[in-house]
Amino acid sequence: MGYNIHSNRKELVLVNPFQQHRWETDLTIQEGENFNLRKIMEESRGLESEEQCTAFYHADYSSLHDPFLFNDMELAVELVDQVRRQGGKILIFGDYDCDGLTSTALLLRFFHASGIHAEARIPNRLEEGYGLNEAAVEDIMRDPPALLITVDCGSSSAELVQKLMQAGIAVILTDHHELSQEEPRPLAFLNPCRRGERYPFKGLAGVGVALKFAMAMAERFCPETNPLPWISLAALGTVADSMPLLDENRALVRLGLDYFYEAAVPGLRLLGESLKPEIRKGEKPGTEFFSFSLVPRLNAAGRMGDTEPALTLLTTDDEGEALAAAAALEKQNEERRRLEREICAEAVERIHRDDPLLHRNLILLADPAWHLGVLGIVASRLSQRFQRPALVFGGDQAGEYRGSARSYGDFDILEAIASGREYCENFGGHRLAAGVSVKEAKFEDFAAALRDYAALPRSAFESTVSHHSLCILPHRYVQEESLNILNDFEPYGQANERPIFQINHLSLLNLRLVGGGEHLSVTLGLDDGREIGGIAFRSGELAKLFVRGDKVDVRAELKLHVWNEHRELQLLLHDMRFSEAERRQMEIEKEASQRWREGRPLTELESGGTLDPAMIPSFWCFLEKILKAGFRPLDTGLIGQAFRLAGGSKISVFTVERLLDLLAEMGLITLNKLQTGEVSAELCALDSSAKRPQLSAQATWKRLLAEGGVKNVG
């Protein structure tokens, strides 16, 4: 089935319901073989020895590496000690995202607790952008600190670091990003990715490096300090930045979750309790709670251009201040969501209204009024909704268009932007996501260059990604005991993903739309007579394909659904498709259709149906709605199923493909057969003055008529 639900929770993104994807399992368990879920999970995590299993299951404070393994840690601590003894001022230069904010807050908390004068500066995302910048450096030099410490930035700012040091400001860089060709030369440089760095783990977040710095300073200045509040910040920033939950990151995040209620900084605890009251009763939050509840609210501060509430929340010990900051963050997040919804809706309306835009391979939209802080989210939504790359631009006060780009399929969006580099002020990113700035006067030339680049065959935009599950889960293992085993592998996250299982041959007992039609709730029957509920977020379109009684396969996570102190096992659906027998019949009909195209007469084929001319108008109306909604590519078997549920008659794949051929021959659509076996169709711009095409004049109609493939002909 064609629902690739990229994320695991409420931010699930709707993808084309009429597209088939290849399902694969990472581990193949032979039928009759002893099924051991714990062993399967251990194998998938590369846990082969008893020692590896012990380290994985019991990751704790003792799993953390010595911070003094960093090449420059001794020097960095000594520099701070000099400033401390001299009573000098320290300035922490951070970043506006959750990793940068938690890094900044962590060092501020340490310095304030140690009696060291420290202040913080966070660049404004909307005005300054990421990291050290010329304007910020000039401002800093007007009131210079004795020591500047960067967190979560600085590795790509060699010239600006040199400028600060020439002005007499000592600089310590703490960062985790890959370095540019020119390595900065501060007095001390803490970055696990630095060339020649001996620190044993390269996967720390920016806040992980800040934590190591604080722990090293605490060891020298105040060894009795409790590090758990810092670890709560480090855990949140590590999850927010999608760092691998391996090695000491696993220990950091586990500690941060286990001791969240007892030891998290007051602002985080209060915000967490307001969003998840069960925390007050001792329930531990999970990484999903961090990712989908706390992180978006902290990131909203940066997106909206005002990080003060976020930094206050993370640094204050006053509950009144923390509650006020949490309320301000909630307001910012609501505004972020409102802007995102409004801009998305406006963008979709423009695409539907503008025929050329709907037909192009690449979406490029600009509006100087669109808020710069949400453009990346909007571009991602449009890319998935219309299944093509998307670039979305807003304007700034300097007369520039600043945009975010998201790719689709195998298309290299950074290479596309580079094709118009002569018109860009700057750009960067990677093949899947990028950012770009263009002067307003050059924007149309830039847009034309991108459209020329994207005038490629549709195959360039096809997604070749398979949908992977850990293994096929037997029905008898769909139970809470299995979930207990899976809980031992927490915390889940990057490089330790929560497992998705393929569960075959389920009975679809009930389905209903919930959440205003946005989500789909199902009841599924297992082969032992038990029933289990399932939810597919942002997947209401699934109701166009399935009915009660269908046999289906699903890709899903096992989850425990808790409400009003009632606990119930539930499936969180990622994909749903027809079971093997139905899919096999579709393939037989597709093969018959292909042989007919190759010249085999209808009488020699099991085509699965004939064409009734009375269905052509209703099929055309049905298809037009699908294409106007931007769905592509299309699986002809799923199109037939959806047409039946939309009120049309039951038709075979062969008939669907003949109807598409006829509409293409009549000039109503353009039709391309894709390498995946699906089709891509586009609506044609119709000339109202042109002569209306006649069905009887089309080659497909004539051949079907001659071979007895048309019924109800007068």
Model-predicted regions and their roles:
Residues 151-204:
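Histidine/acidic-residue-rich, glycine-tolerant segments that coordinate divalent metal ions
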Residues 80, 137, 161-162, 660:
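Short amphipathic alpha-helical segments and helix-helix/interface helices
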Residues 106, 183-223, 227-239, 618-619:
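Short alpha-helices
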Residues 176-177, 371, 430, 519:
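Histidine-centered active-site/metal-ligand motif
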Residues 17, 26-147, 167-168, 219-448, ...:
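Hydrophobic helix-and-loop "lid/oligomerization" segment in the mid-to-C-terminal part
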